[in-house]
Each structure stands twice: as structure tokens, then as C-alpha cells.
Amino acid sequence: MVRMPCSLYMREPHSHRRAGPLGALGTRRSASSEGSFQSEGPTRPMRTRRRRFRIAFRVAKVLLVIVVLFAVAVGLLFLLTPSAGQATALVRAQARDRHITYPGPPVPAYFAQALVATEDHRFYSDPGVDPLAMGRVVISWITGREDQGGSTIDQQLAKNLYTGGHSGFTEDLEQLAMAVKLNQTYSRPQILRMYAEVAYYGHGYYGLDAASCGYFGRPPDRLTLVQAAMLAGVVNAPSYDDPLVYPRQARTRLVHVIGRMAAVGYLTRAEETAALNAPLGLSAVRGCA
């Protein structure tokens, strides 16, 4: 028997790893398939951004619809609310009920400056309402919370004259409409004078004349800067800032008012310092001599 060499039965080492055309093609296909799998579709951060954008867009559309409906409601109220031409008659009626005279003395410059600086620093340029106030009313309606934002002087006057001092969604809408009407009907000095006469100053005093005589024993035209600033500041929270009952709170409020007058340019820093160091001069005797 002839024996064959062993080498004929042995495979060449690593011959099974040789990459033929099909093997190379298969390798390339695998790499291609892997690459296409990795690039298939947007990445997760991109999908998250798109989802957030869609949500924000939907929320914006809902808010836009609410604002449009709100504007329509204000427009209807503008047509349905009474004329602002009767405002002076309403002020006179309130003054008569409280045994005070309207029109009273002119509003002193210091009082007007302090009131505008603290309550409505755009009083001489705004249309009677703060554009942001409309948004606050909508938010308060959606959340069910009372609007704590600041109101213009025209809005506060409308609140006192037309809604009985009450607040609520419909009352706030009416106040916005009437504030615009008041702004279109009366001059700025007339608005200030009406406001000064119907405002409550605490301690039972309605009207600037009664408050000036009650707290300081002098008419409004003789008020000092610090006295006028105190009266302008107390109308925001008359029961809480009553200087005869809560002098510490009244002092804090006075410092704020004086600071606002300086911030908007009515007072220099030297005048601000002098006012903060000036005596308030509360009278022990109620009423003007």
C-alpha cells in the first residue's frame, strides 16, 4: 500500500479566514447595514425638541384664542357699559353722601406726583389701562386667583365709581372698559381730582380734604412734601397703613413712596434724603381750624 503524504490531508492554516469576493461583499454589506441602522430616523434629543415645540405651539394657539375672546368681551363691554360723562355726577353723589364738598380744593403738586409715582408712573402716557393688566385678568380667570397686579389710576377710579369697589372677572373687565372711557373723556388733572375725592385714606376719612384736615389739621394746599406723600401712599392699603393706628407700617410705606418719587425723577437725591428726615407732623386735633 502506498501511503500519501500527510500534507495532502492538512488544511492550510487560517485558510477559512480568507476573504473572497463574497466574503468581502458580505463584510461591506454588514458595515453598510450597520451604518444605515445608526442613521435611521432623528436622534432622541431632536425628537424631544420637536415634541416640545409641538406642545408649545399648541399652548400658544390656546392662549391666542383666549386673548382674542377676551378682547371681544372687552369690546362688548365697551358698548354695553355706561357713558363716562356721568363720572362727575357720581363723584358728587358720593361726596354728598359723605358730607364733603365736590369739587374740593385743587390737588397739590406734591400729592399728584407722589400718587403717580407710586400707583401709575405711566399715568400721563397710558390709554387708561396697562396693556399687561389685560393679561393679568385672563390669568386670574384661568387660575381662579384674584388679580394682585397693579391697576392704573383710571382703573381704580372706575372701580370706585362703577363696580362698588368690588373685584372679580366681570368687574375687572368692566373696570378696564370704563378706564378707557374715562381716559378719553377727561383730562389728567380732572381724573386726579375725581380720584382724590373718592379715595379712602383710612381712619374714616374719604376725600383728600377730609384726610388732610384729619391727619394734619391743615388744608391740602398747605401740606408738606412728606405729608402729601403719606396721604398718596395710604390709599393703597388704608386700614393697614393708617399712621395713627399702625405708625411703623405707615413709615415703611412712606419710605417707599419717597423712593418712588426720586426713582421717576420728581425728587433729587438730596430732596429724597431731606424728606425722609423731615417730621411727619400728625395733628392731635382732628379737623382744620
Predicted regions and their residues:
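Juxtamembrane regions of bacterial inner-membrane/periplasmic proteins
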Residues: V2-A289
